Amino acid sequence: MGVFVKLGAEYFSSAELVFYRSLFGLVVIYLIIRLQGLSLATPNLKMHFWRGFSGFVALMLFFYALSVLPLATAITLNYTSPLFLAMFTTVMLREGPRPLLIFTIILGFAGVVFLLRPTLHAEQLNAGLLGLLSGFFAGIAYLNVKQLGAMGEPEWRVVFYFTLFCTLGGGIWMLFHSFHA
């Protein structure tokens, strides 16, 4: 996906790329849901909102980073999401800080810094921070997915509401920014 976003970023904004990616996925998952006669009703709409919001922000930031930074750099920054997820589960789910986990999280971030130091130029610092934030928000989104699963939400419903949120969010964002025909 990263390669296609990088290529598409020459012609489309991040909001447009998120919108079109999500719209296609929304249509497909909606058709599957309807063909199988599944229900979209959920008692966990608030949690779906937070999962959609965090995933949308992560996707927007990731697509922006892909448009500005070298492909490998943007992907490396986004791939910090498991490190953030490990931190979130320790704090938010009260899984307790284990010394080995803390050490591996620090080691993981040190590795990211080591990998990026020679490739991230001063003028790319803001884009780099936004790319890192994409990993942060993706970690939150993954935590939300774990919580939704614990609430008994099926995967297809989680995917539907996420793509719906991203389609709406990307569409609204496009209204306030440049649009490419």
PLM region descriptions:
Residues 100-117:
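Hydrophobic transmembrane alpha-helices of multi-pass small-molecule transport proteins
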Residues 37, 64, 81-103:
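C-terminal transmembrane-helix exit sites in multi-pass transporters
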